[in-house]
Amino acid sequence: GLAAALAAEGAVVVGGNLAAVRGDEWWSLTLLGSVARGRAWTRAGARPGDLLAVTGWPGRAAAGLALSRLESPEAFRAASDEAWKPLLEAWLRPRARVGFALALAPAGAVTAAIDVSDGFAGDLARLCEASGVGCDVHARSLPVDPPLERATGALGLSFTTLRFGPSDDYELLLAIDPGRRDACERAARESGTPLVFAGRFTDRRGELSLVTADGATRPLEPRGFDHFAGER
């Protein structure tokens, strides 16, 4: 398809918002920038032993979207409650972690990076695939999120589904050199960015595992938003 058409002209896809949509109207926005040679953060480069750093509150946007789709009057009133405001804000007004990224970039601590635009597990899987590594995610190290926990009952969705499934949060998943962890924590403090170290990259290529609070390990399914579901 697209790759073959570009190949005929000696061109390649370097990124962008590729999707299949139905309907007469759609919007797309592309931003271009520049970075010094060798300083760009890419998905490739994570190494076994690197730390997994996570900004903010992954899963909130998914909960906000689900709340916005509730149809009954009782459910609508619940979604309008102040308790749900952080979830609706995450979906309606996401904020990229630009200040944190600018504060962290000079430290040279990041070996690979991706933003959570399709879902925590799905985007982490893409980073691992590009880097040729796996990752163990520790549930106990992820941020406690009372609004997200409360939403599970109202929505009938599990916390795991909201936290790791499809969600356009625009938080960052970073592979961090263990020797430069302090620099990452300092950048988070300086920029006022919530940050946790939630796991470690492994040599088990493509394998994502969730280490539960009781120490058990189970596969973490790489679920994320499917941009081409509309054509199937």
Residue ranges of each PLM-predicted region?
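Glycine-/charge-enriched secondary-structure boundary and capping motifs
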Residues: G1-V14, L18-W27, L31-L32, P106, ...
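Short alpha-helix capping/helix-loop boundary micro-motifs
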Residues: A36-A40
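Glycine-centered structural positions embedded in regular secondary structure
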Residues: G1, G33-V35, G64-L65, R69, ...
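Glycine/charged-rich beta-loop-alpha catalytic/anionic-binding loops adjacent to active sites
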Residues: S34-V35, D81-L87, L155-G156
